[in-house]
């Protein structure tokens, strides 16, 4: 059962940097619904993409799986036999809860839940890879290498779903969408103190890119096609396609 996020409702003397620890994991479903506009839509539509792209006898990777929402959405929509989902996260608290969530929903497609660094995971025979608000937590210098590895591990006709918080090259647009996002959080019950303290903890950990930067990286990795398929304020999701026909 998810608890309401009140982690930052009182002043914290020494904030430090953001970590996905036990306290965050406990309130994560409430936190992300109230903080990320369009999150539920992205999760459900990842399932729709899985129905289109996942092929028999292949693997799906959910890199930075948190509590397994995307994994469950994918699994509900797989229409083929002999598929496997590999869900990876480096947070022990997230992984523990993810395993419980996955086990609570029975389905034919097996899920392997892995506690580990997504940079160290071998990607092979993949028809679909999901990076759902994960890449932004890697050092910028490490992002291209991960995308390169994903492209190489995808089968022809495979897809990468890349969801992120965006920055904007147009400062005026960036300011508007930043303010709209804060309005969204206020409307969901977060106080100015909560918004400010969480932002302070995230600012050195979550480093955002523009859509243009993401597309440039995807092209460099080898993806022949990529496009923004969902956006709400400064959050959104791209799909990148590897050319070829699935076997």
Curated annotation (Swiss-Prot):
CDD domains registered for this protein in UniProt: AdoMet_MTases
Record carries keyword ATP-binding: no
Binding of S-adenosyl-L-methionine, residues: 39, 64-66, 89-90, 117-118, 132, 199
Ranges annotated as spanning the membrane: none
Catalytic activity line of the entry: prephenate + S-adenosyl-L-methionine = carboxy-S-adenosyl-L-methionine + 3-phenylpyruvate + H2O
GO BP field: tRNA wobble uridine modification
Reported consequences of knocking out the gene: Deletion mutant shows accumulation of 5-methoxyuridine (mo5U34) and 5-hydroxyuridine (ho5U34) in tRNA.
Pfam family, one: Methyltransf_25
Role according to the record: Catalyzes the conversion of S-adenosyl-L-methionine (SAM) to carboxy-S-adenosyl-L-methionine (Cx-SAM).
Assembly mode: Homodimer.
Protein name (record): Carboxy-S-adenosyl-L-methionine synthase
């Amino acid at each position: 059962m998810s608890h309401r996020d009140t982690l930052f409702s009182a002043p914290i003397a020494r904030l430090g940097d953001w970590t996905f620890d036990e306290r965050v994991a406990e309130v994560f479903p409430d936190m992300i619904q109230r903080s990320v506009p369009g999150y539920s839509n992205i999760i459900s539509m990842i399932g729709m993409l899985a129905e289109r792209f996942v092929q028999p006898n292949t693997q799906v990777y959910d890199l930075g799986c948190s509590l397994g929402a995307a994994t469950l959405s994918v699994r509900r929509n797989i229409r083929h036999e002999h598929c496997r989902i590999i869900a990876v996260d480096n947070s022990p608290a997230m992984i523990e809860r993810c395993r419980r969530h996955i086990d609570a929903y029975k389905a034919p497609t097996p899920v392997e839940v892995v506690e580990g660094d997504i940079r160290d995971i071998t990607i092979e025979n993949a028809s679909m890879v999901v990076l759902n608000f994960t890449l932004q937590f890697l050092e910028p210098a490490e992002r291209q290498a991960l995308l390169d590895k994903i492209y190489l591990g995808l089968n022809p006709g495979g897809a990468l779903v890349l969801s992120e918080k965006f920055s904007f090259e147009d400062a005026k647009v960036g300011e508007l969408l930043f303010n709209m996002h804060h309005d969204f959080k206020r409307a969901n019950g977060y106080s100015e103190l909560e918004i400010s303290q969480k932002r302070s903890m995230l600012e050195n950990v979550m480093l955002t890119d523009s859509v243009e930067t993401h597309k440039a990286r995807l092209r460099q990795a080898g993806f022949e096609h990529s496009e923004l398929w969902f956006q709400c304020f400064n959050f959104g999701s791209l799909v990148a396609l590897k050319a070829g026909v699935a076997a």
